[in-house]
């Protein structure tokens, strides 16, 4: 199966299935001399980990990461870093009843059409369980970006259903189970999740990811534009159906006089572009938003077909998230960090000697 890798200079390749023995990834391109421990990676893995609150799937995976290679005495050696997480709480029997039935809204039907075979246990390779390795690799990138360049990558839940959360307080994000930055909406989010669990249904969400202190100049012309690569990375996250950079689709309602980010001697006057102009970072905060669909793994009966093409009605049993947007927050951070680290290394390789007389804010 192709398509298991992302990045050029900083390259991440993942492997493993939801109910397989383990998940793993190979991280190439990490410069030598970076202090990295398993504990550094575990912080973000614990934020994504299932079974940590009543609002997410009750599959209880410790997601303990092991560093297999590329780190010696707590420091990267410049060689490939191998990471592994063992699966310990698989309940494959939950899926035996659907091995010959295609769950509506899932990848069952398309995987079967493409490969002629599929791992029906929790979706196999198409499961969001795969993203644990992205988060582990992204933690390496986040640490490098922050320690080396002062770049901070953060994300939060800014919408669940029709509940809109204002980006008011980054510190609050880590203090509630929704990763919400808006304290005034916590009770509404709790009530909605209780309602969904009682109904056996799910809801969509919006996650906002912001990278601050990104230097100007990252990104390549035309096909490797920074915003194109960010959109590609974020769109590859399970359940993501839309990506916006900056004001995104909101620019449709703006005039050119409103949308352009004017420049003064003190810097930009606005950031409608989301920190990227012409596919290259402008030094403003990079802002992206992702829309995540409501999971199709719900207790509400739905129509589908079996292998024989016969119409059947099914209920998806198992342990699932009423809102996948909650655990998508650390995943979005990881994918943004992976892209930024890749482009920083590419910029250093090609343009390290470039000196500009333009001001940098």
Curated annotation (Swiss-Prot):
CC cofactor note: Reduced FMN (FMNH(2)).
Taxonomic source organism: Photorhabdus laumondii subsp. laumondii (strain DSM 15139 / CIP 105565 / TT01) (Photorhabdus luminescens subsp. laumondii)
GO cellular component: cytosol
Main EC class the enzyme belongs to: lyase
Gene Ontology biological-process entries: amino acid biosynthetic process; aromatic amino acid family biosynthetic process; chorismate biosynthetic process
Pathway connected to this protein: Metabolic intermediate biosynthesis; chorismate biosynthesis; chorismate from D-erythrose 4-phosphate and phosphoenolpyruvate: step 7/7
The protein's name: Chorismate synthase
Binding site for NADP(+): 48, 54
Top-level taxon of the source organism: Bacteria
A Gene Ontology molecular function term of the record: chorismate synthase activity
Chemical reaction(s) catalysed: 5-O-(1-carboxyvinyl)-3-phosphoshikimate = chorismate + phosphate
Summary of subunit composition and partner proteins: Homotetramer.
Binding-site list for FMN: 125-127, 238-239, 278, 293-297, 319
Cofactor(s) it depends on: FMNH2
Classification via HAMAP family: Chorismate_synth (MF_00300)
Keyword list, A-Z: Amino-acid biosynthesis, Aromatic amino acid biosynthesis, FAD, Flavoprotein, FMN, Lyase, NADP
PANTHER family (UniProt xref): CHORISMATE SYNTHASE (PTHR21085:SF0)
InterPro entries reported in the protein's UniProt record: Chorismate_synth (IPR000453), Chorismate_synth_AroC_sf (IPR035904), Chorismate_synthase_CS (IPR020541)
Described purpose of this protein according to its UniProt entry: This reaction introduces a second double bond into the aromatic ring system.
Keyword Transmembrane: no
Keyword match Transmembrane helix: no
EC number: 4.2.3.5
Family: Belongs to the chorismate synthase family.
Lineage, opening ranks: Bacteria, Pseudomonadati, Pseudomonadota, Gammaproteobacteria, Enterobacterales
Pfam families: Chorismate_synt
């Amino acid at each position: 199966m192709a398509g298991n890798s992302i990045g050029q200079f900083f390259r991440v390749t993942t492997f493993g299935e939801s109910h397989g023995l383990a998940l793993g990834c190979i991280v190439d391109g990490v410069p030598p001399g970076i202090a990295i421990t398993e504990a550094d990676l575990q912080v973000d893995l614990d934020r994504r980990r299932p079974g940590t609150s009543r609002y997410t799937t009750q599959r209880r995976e410790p997601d303990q990461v092991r560093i297999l290679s590329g780190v010696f005495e707590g420091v990267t050696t410049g060689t490939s870093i191998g990471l592994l997480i063992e699966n310990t709480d698989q309940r494959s029997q939950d899926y035996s009843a659907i091995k010959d039935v295609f769950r509506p809204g899932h990848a069952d039907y398309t995987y079967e059409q493409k490969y002629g075979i599929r791992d029906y246990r929790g979706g196999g390779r198409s499961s969001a369980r795969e993203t644990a390795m992205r988060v582990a690799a992204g933690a390496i990138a986040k640490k490098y970006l922050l320690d080396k360049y002062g770049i901070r990558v953060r994300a939060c839940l800014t919408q669940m259903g029709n509940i809109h959360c204002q980006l008011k307080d980054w510190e609050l994000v880590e203090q509630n189970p929704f990763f919400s930055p808006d304290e005034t909406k916590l009770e509404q989010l709790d009530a909605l999740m209780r309602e969904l669990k009682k109904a056996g249904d799910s809801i969509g969400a919006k996650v906002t990811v912001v990278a601050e202190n990104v230097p100007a100049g990252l990104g390549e012309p035309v096909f490797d534009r920074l915003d194109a690569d960010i959109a590609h990375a974020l769109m590859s996250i399970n359940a993501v159906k839309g990506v916006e950079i900056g004001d995104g689709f909101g620019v449709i309602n703006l005039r050119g006089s409103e949308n352009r980010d004017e420049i003064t001697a003190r810097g930009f006057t606005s950031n409608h572009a989301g920190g990227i102009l012409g596919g290259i970072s402008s030094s403003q905060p990079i802002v992206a938003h992702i829309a995540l669909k409501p999971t199709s793994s719900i207790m509400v009966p739905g129509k589908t077909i079996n292998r024989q093409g016969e119409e059947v009605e099914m209920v998806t049993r198992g342990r699932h998230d009423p809102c996948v947007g909650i655990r998508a927050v650390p995943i979005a951070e990881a994918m943004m960090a992976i892209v930024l680290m890749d482009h920083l290394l590419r910029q250093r390789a090609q343009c390290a000697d470039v000196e500009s007389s333009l001001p940098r804010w």
